[in-house]
From Swiss-Prot:
Functional pathway: Carbohydrate biosynthesis; gluconeogenesis
Name of the protein this chain belongs to: Pyruvate carboxylase, mitochondrial
Top-level division of the source organism's lineage: Eukaryota
PTM annotation, UniProt: Acetylation of Lys-748 might play a role in catalytic activity regulation.
Species assigned in the record: Bos taurus
GO molecular function ontology, one term from the record: metal ion binding
Modified residues (Phosphothreonine): T1003
Length: 1178
């Protein structure tokens, strides 16, 4: 660095003495007049313009910027002392190609010299000549040299004359496709088209066969014309797997030429450089000498002055071929500056002033390589979508800096808008270290520090390159990216903070994302979490299970003295009272207290049933993640889930392998006890669920769903003998525990005594578990009767979450058995604290609380037999539709519907079938008799029809006739177990499909969620990809968002806490958006949120639906430049449909399917946003 500072210091000193005459370089060097430059205009934009402005400022030179109408907000115009608009009314690129405007600005503002930067006019001889004709110096080679070097065919001829080896190719630009055919016939494939008047990858296309020739010729010509104003092409033999090595040269007006060694630019995509290295690693010294000497020789051949680059291909045998000269500064000039300590822009300006290289202290023998430098081009491109350019507003920009890191950027800042009009380069990151691995480490660290939000970037891809062993070894060629597909295994950025801000802003603008049934706000205060002792929780029944296995666990339960309790607060209680809406956030907060205080519980019911799909559908949480997190917090108490037999946790039948895999993965994630039931007590379904749970290593708890009344001799269908017979079958099948599942709360104390004592007498060694609901108000009495009759376990809920359609009170059972042989051992004072927490938590869910419409339970449940959760739902639905006064009729219809279907056992999904039929009868004003009489003409609910077809199994006593025959007519009927005929689901294929659909690592848990609920899972993944980890938000923020000026904290993980303050919401803009302002960790953040209500009244181009294969969307924002098909056209898979242009690159959109074009939604020259619908194929 000392040498670097010395050289730059000397250059600044020279700037001060601008009025003096240059000292002679040597006695034999010809003398030129020194003309100091006082004002420089950069005929370019972006980071290269700023790079030149900075150099000029260091030399005391005034700077002038030019900008297009589209660049009014770009940083380069602000970095200059003066800035002027050019190309008014022209297309974005054409503005910077408009020579008359640029010369006019230079003349009118007394500009001494023009720096062309790179790209645009930098290699146009007519521009260099126009500057010279106007009396303005061109900081670069003479117009004649620019013309010769810019014409790649002439440059090739010069190289041949200089004795520099070249690649076989045409001697002049080709003018027709026919000439390309002739060259291919002579030299064979592969060949490459190259733009004759520019580089940077534009106008380059590799062709491997005659079939590809015409399309690639057309595209290359079009790209060259758009980028350089001239579509001329030449064609060369394509050398496969070469290294791309370029040599930096520098010349003065005195004939001095020197080189600054080489750069390795082999890491390319579509012939565009991605990562550049200086010097080239593991380059043979003799090859380096040949490359540098040939470069100097070629420069001397044409009298080259100023900075330039000579590019070569080096084949695998070490033979080099000249390909072109870039008569300008290169994008990657930075790495050469870092390793040679030479400021190339300073040198360019001084040479243009008339100084000699020796004057500047630049002699070949003094140029030494110091360490290694790497440059990464951070672009707004999406590597996961073939590097398609992304556009939009940068919401967050934080760069990586530190020792050995240099950043060259332009409009890389929060609030900057990335348009589709220009190059996608965001910032150049340059790392300098003592050697290649050190520079790579510094670069990797710097990129890891970057935070860019609002647009996609290629940073994840660059990080993969930097960590690649081949790259670290330094031996790469131009096929490096193509031959390392693992580079595209991208780790998605978590981006949690910004996603959460998007969610909060969305809720603030549009309201809750989950349907809110009641207009009630969450409690403004958080529930109080009781004090938790320090240290691990005491041992519990799970420790026995882990030590002795399911059989040993069952023995321990049976041998336990006193009554055991299962707490349903984490699942069934809130399913019954709060529409299953309790979030993981609130479950986690109380979990450590439960682990420490209730270690004597038999189990905690916390998973399965409706909680699985509701978590994804309405709470936007992963149910598996809930299980994993709760397991970590409660290691000592067994977890229990509700498994719907062959239906697992869904509402339909699944292939057997899905049910088995589900149980296996649930067990791996921490589930212990599988309470297996079937809504019809259909034995084949029960046995399948039991087998799946048992094979997974879980505790099998077979559950008999209870209905009727065994204490009533007149109720003969579901008699004591029925239940005893079914119990015999389940015990014979190997259940570890037997459960009576009383989902409606129909067990009266007398019936409890009869049923439980009979089971205890028949199965003295088998643990008995009783589940009920407290709808009638007799739940506590019933559970006490069960306990006295010999039950080992009964279900309870926290006091504040008990009663009504939930389970009986935990505190009541604990108090009633205290000091008796049935003592639960649960500390009553801990129950009080637990209840207080849930009382506070329940207030957060006021919008879902059943007490909004239902004030008490009702003993009429003994007549209508409606299950607890369904009773709550039906009651609320009736009131929400203004039919609260008719709820009695709904209950009456439920009784009639049940009898009409043959008196079913009613639990999900059979209870839903009865409920659907009941509502159908009420809505149509039908009695049971009328519905049965008109059965052949009525359109019954789908669930009823499928039940009668046998899709959920066969009910006890068979299907009701003649109703079944009347309804089904000729519809097919399922014989036997419904899932038995289903072929196994290809889970590996599903995993592959999900990976393609969601573009990230898919877990076995994800696969099973998608197998159970494909549409719900897809929506959940899309939602969380947009809005992030919502379970870190407290429930009030989740439901209604923050108030303006509210400050709060969000803990993402241990040690990572966000400090957020909501600041303001803007008025509606023309795009139907509102800007929402936050303060995040002390920094201002703003996001744009679509106002969904306002947008209903505005017209926007339709978006392609990702799940509809025939809908073809724009892969990137851009302009339609060609449409290749029309409505009615037949297309094949892979056939080009249209061509988009963005950031000076063209992309051909191809058909993903075979079919017929139904409708074309775009026209030529239309500007599209990403995913805008292009056309539909059917």
């Amino acid at each position: 660095m000392l040498k670097f500072q010395t050289v730059r210091g000397s250059l600044r000193l020279l700037a001060i003495r601008r009025t003096s005459t240059a000292t002679a370089a040597s006695p034999n060097v010809r003398r030129l007049e020194y003309k100091p430059i006082k004002k420089v205009m950069v005929a370019n934009r972006g980071e290269i313009a700023i790079r030149v402005f900075r150099a000029c400022t260091e030399l005391g030179i005034r700077t002038v910027a030019v900008y297009s109408e589209q660049d009014t907000g770009q940083m380069h115009r602000q970095k200059a002392d003066e800035a002027y608009l050019i190309g008014r009314g022209l297309a974005p690129v054409q503005a910077y190609l408009h020579i008359p405007d640029i010369i006019k600005v230079a003349k009118e503002n007394n500009v001494d010299a023009v720096h062309p930067g790179y790209g645009f006019l930098s290699e146009r001889a007519d521009f260099a000549q126009a500057c010279q004709d106007a009396g303005v110096r061109f900081i670069g080679p003479s117009p004649e040299v620019v013309r010769k070097m810019g014409d790649k065919v002439e440059a090739r001829a010069i190289a041949i004359a200089a004795g520099v080896p070249v690649v076989p190719g045409t001697d002049a630009p080709i003018t027709s496709l026919h000439e390309a055919h002739e060259f291919s016939n002579t030299y064979g494939f592969p060949i490459i088209f190259k733009a004759a008047y520019g580089g940077g990858g534009r106008g380059m296309r590799v062709v491997h066969s005659y079939e590809e020739l015409e399309e690639n010729y057309t595209r290359a010509y079009s790209e060259a014309l758009a980028a350089f104003g001239n579509g001329a092409l030449f064609v060369e033999k394509f050398i496969e797997k070469p290294r791309h090595i370029e040599v930096q040269i520098l010349g003065d007006q005195y004939g001095n030429i020197l080189h600054l060694y080489e750069r390795d630019c082999s890491i390319q995509r579509r012939h565009q450089k991605v990562v550049e290295i200086a010097p080239a690693a593991h380059l043979d010294p003799q090859l380096r000498t040949r490359l540098t000497s040939d470069s100097v020789k070629l420069a001397k051949q044409v009298g080259y002055e100023n900075a330039g680059t000579v590019e070569f291909l080096v084949d695998r045998h070490g033979k080099h071929y000249f390909i072109e000269v870039n008569s300008r500064l290169q994008v990657e000039h930075t790495v050469t500056e870092e390793i040679t300590d030479v400021d190339l822009v300073h040198a360019q300006i001084h040479v243009a002033e008339g100084r000699s290289l020796p004057d500047l202290g630049l002699r070949q023998e003094n140029i030494r390589i110091n360490g290694c430098a790497i440059q990464c081009r951070v672009t707004t491109e999406d590597p996961a979508r073939s590097f398609q350019p992304d556009t939009g507003r940068i919401e967050v920009f934080r760069s990586g800096e530190g020792m050995g890191i240099r950043l060259d950027n332009a409009s890389a800042f929060q609030g900057a808008v990335i348009s589709p009009h220009y190059d996608s380069l965001l910032v150049k990151v340059i790392a300098h270290g003592k050697d290649h691995p050190t520079a790579a480490t510094k670069m990797s660290r710097a990129l890891a520090e970057f935070r860019v939000r609002g647009v996609k970037t290629n940073i994840p891809f660059l990080q993969n390159v930097l960590n690649n062993q081949q790259f670290l070894a330094g031996t790469v060629d131009t096929q490096f990216i193509d031959e390392n597909p693992e580079l595209f295994q991208l780790r998605p950025a978590q981006n949690r903070a910004q996603k959460l801000l998007h969610y909060l802003g969305h809720v603030m603008v549009n309201g809750p994302t989950t349907p809110i049934p009641v207009k009630a706000s969450p409690s403004p205060t958080d529930p109080i979490v009781p004090v938790v002792p320090i240290g691990p929780p005491p041992t519990g029944f799970r420790d026995i299970l882990l030590r002795e296995g399911p059989e040993g666990f069952a023995r321990a339960v049976r041998n336990h003295e006193g009554l055991l309790l299962m707490d349903t607060t984490f699942r069934d209680a809130h399913q019954s009272l709060l529409a299953t809406r309790v979030r993981t956030h609130d479950l986690k907060k109380i979990s450590p207290y439960v682990a420490h205080s209730f270690n004597k519980l038999f189990s905690i019911e916390n998973w399965g049933g409706a909680t699985f799909d509701v978590a994804m559908r309405f709470l936007y949480e992963c149910p598996w993640r809930r299980l994993q997190e709760l397991r970590e917090l409660v290691p000592n108490i067994p977890f229990q889930m509700l498994l719907r037999g062959a239906n697992a946790v869904g509402y339909t039948n699944y292939p057997d392998n899905v049910v088995f895999k589900f149980c296996e993965v649930a067990k791996e994630n921490g589930m212990d006890i599988f309470r297996v039931f079937d809504s019809l007590n259909y034995l084949p379904n029960l046995l399948l669920g039991m087998e799946a749970a048992g094979s997974a290593g879980g505790v099998v708890e077979a559950a008999i769903s209870y209905t009727g009344d065994v204490s009533d001799p007149s109720r003969t269908k579901y008699s004591l003998q029925y239940y005893m017979g079914l119990a015999e079958e389940l015990v014979r099948a190997g259940t570890h525990i037997l459960c009576i599942k009383d989902m409606a709360g129909l067990l009266k104390p007398t019936a409890c005594t009869m049923l439980v004592s009979s089971l205890r007498d028949r199965f003295p060694d088998l643990p008995l578990h009783i589940h009920t609901h407290d709808t009638s108000g007799a739940g506590v009495a019933a559970m006490l009767a069960c306990a006295h009759a010999g039950a080992d376990v009964v279900d309870v809920a926290a006091d504040s979450m008990s009663g009504m359609t939930s389970q009986p009170s935990m505190g009541a059972l604990v108090a009633c058995t205290r000091g008796t042989p049935l003592d639960t051992g649960v500390p009553l004072e801990r129950v009080f604290d637990y209840s207080e927490y849930w009382e506070g938590a329940r207030g957060l869910y006021a919008a879902f609380d059943c007490t909004a419409t239902m004030k008490s339970g009702n003993s009429d449940v003994y007549e209508n037999e409606i299950p607890g959760g369904q009773y709550t739902n039906l009651h609320f639905q009736a009131h929400s539709m203004g039919l609260g006064s008719k709820f009695k009729e709904v209950k009456k219809a439920y009784v009639e519907a049940n009898q009409m279907l043959g008196d079913l056992i009613k639990v999900t999904p059979s209870s839903k079938i009865v409920g659907d039929l009941a509502q159908f009868m009420v809505q149509n004003g039908l009695t049971r008799a009328e519905a049965e009489a008109q059965a052949e003409e009525l359109s019954f609910p789908r669930s009823v029809v499928e039940f009668l077809q046998g899709y959920i199994g066969i009910p006890h006593g068979g299907f009701p006739e003649p109703l079944r025959s009347k309804v089904l007519k000729d519809l097919p009927r399922v014989e036997g177990r419904p899932g038995a005929s289903l072929p196994p689901l290809d889970l590996q294929a599903l995993e592959k499909e999900l990976t393609e659909r969601h573009g990230e690592e898919v877990t076995p848990e994800d696969v099973l969620s998608a197998a159970m609920y494909p549409d719900v899972f897809a929506h959940f993944k899309d939602f969380t990809a947009t809005f992030g980890p919502l379970d870190s938000l407290n429930t009030r923020l989740f439901l209604q968002g923050p108030k303006i000026a509210e400050e709060f904290e969000v803990e993402l993980e241990r040690g990572k806490t966000l400090h957020i303050k909501a600041l303001a919401i803007s008025d509606l803009n023309r795009a139907g958006q509102r800007q929402v302002f936050f303060e995040l960790n002390g920094q201002l953040r703003s996001i744009l949120v679509k106002d969904t209500q306002a947008m209903k009244e505005m017209h926007f181009h339709p978006k392609a639906l990702k799940d509809v294969k025939g809908q073809i969307g724009a892969p990137m924002p851009g302009k339609v430049i060609d449409i290749k098909v029309a409505a009615g056209a037949k297309v094949t898979k892979g056939q080009p449909l249209c061509v988009l242009s963005a950031m000076k690159m063209e992309t051909v959109v191809t058909s993903p399917v075979e079919g017929t074009v139904r409708k074309v939604h775009v026209t030529k020259d239309m500007t599209l946003e990403g995913d805008d619908l292009i056309l539909e194929i059917e």
